[in-house]
């Protein structure tokens, strides 16, 4: 009897601990109080997030010069998280056009064409576009007509935010082009994937090419005409330029030449009135 009573007592204690540890679990809130409801409550909030999306191509995080990187995981913030630097390294160091004389980890493997999947520089340039795309997807989820109306955003503010959706989609297409150009395929997520619920899929070269091409053509009318956008923001010329580059390398991407299309969009860019600096 004593043994049975002792077992019952022990069972009761365990149940009590379990119940107490689960208490109010549904009442927990994010540690970061900048929830979408707060961040996107005003037109200024939308523009701040859009600026962050553009900024992912040049900055490494939200604090300067370093200390709060967007991407963790033991990667060096200066050399392995910065998009421009990593993209340059991957594109140029394997060629005879550039030399890196530093001994930073595996950087010289790019010269020797002997990098591996565990290379920290490659991990960084894989993670960066996917991180950027994740931000863009959230922006697209939160900038629908329904969300703007629910938040009382209307008039010129709503018009600018709707226009910015085309810019965000361009930047997403650009990031996917980076993945296509460097890796040949990519993890794929868009605004229909709910954060924390859907596992990301994967797209092949052909699928990525088709997605990028269709996105750039779909947003052409939504982007500002050439040289009319606010400084630093993309316009139709950016979409034409990326389409020209996509078509120029189509033989590598999908096995089919699209030189005629490349010429068509290159001519659009040239006709847009862009010029080289007089002294460069």
Model regions and ranges:
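Short, well-structured active-site flanking segments
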Residues: 27-29, 180-191, 259-260
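Short, surface-exposed recognition loops and adjoining beta-strand edges that mediate ligand/DNA contacts
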Residues: 37, 63-90, 189, 224-239, ...
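Bacterial Sec-dependent N-terminal signal peptides
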Residues: 1-31
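Membrane-proximal, proline-rich intrinsically disordered regions
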Residues: 22-82, 280
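Helix-turn-helix repeat elements of alpha-solenoid scaffolds
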Residues: 133-137, 211-218, 258-268
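Conserved, well-structured interaction surfaces
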Residues: 47, 55-61, 94-183, 199, ...
């Amino acid at each position: 009897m004593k043994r049975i009573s002792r077992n019952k007592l022990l069972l009761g204690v365990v149940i009590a601990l379990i119940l107490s540890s689960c208490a109010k679990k549904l009442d927990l809130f994010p540690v970061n109080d900048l929830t979408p409801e707060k961040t996107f409550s005003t037109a200024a909030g939308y523009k701040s997030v859009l600026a962050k999306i553009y900024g992912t191509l040049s900055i490494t995080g939200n604090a300067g010069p370093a200390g709060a990187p967007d991407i963790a995981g033991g990667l060096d913030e200066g050399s392995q998280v910065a998009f421009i630097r990593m993209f340059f390294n991957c594109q140029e160091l394997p060629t005879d056009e550039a030399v890196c004389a530093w001994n930073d980890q595996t950087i010289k493997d790019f010269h020797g064409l002997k990098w591996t999947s565990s290379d920290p520089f490659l991990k960084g340039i894989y993670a960066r576009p996917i991180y950027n795309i994740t931000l863009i997807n959230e922006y697209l989820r939160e900038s629908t007509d329904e969300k703007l109306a629910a938040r009382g955003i209307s008039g010129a503010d709503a018009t600018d935010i709707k226009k910015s959706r085309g810019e965000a989609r361009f930047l997403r297409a650009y990031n996917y082009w980076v993945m296509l150009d460097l890796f040949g395929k990519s993890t794929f997520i868009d605004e229909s994937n709910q954060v924390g619920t859907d596992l990301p899929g994967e797209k092949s070269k052909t699928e990525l090419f088709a997605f990028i091409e269709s996105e750039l053509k779909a947003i052409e009318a939504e982007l500002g005409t050439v040289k009319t956008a606010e400084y630093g923001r993309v316009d139709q010329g950016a979409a034409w330029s990326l389409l020209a580059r996509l078509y120029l390398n189509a033989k590598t991407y999908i096995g089919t030449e699209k030189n005629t299309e490349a010429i068509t969009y290159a001519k659009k860019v040239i006709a847009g009135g862009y010029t080289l600096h007089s002294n460069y």
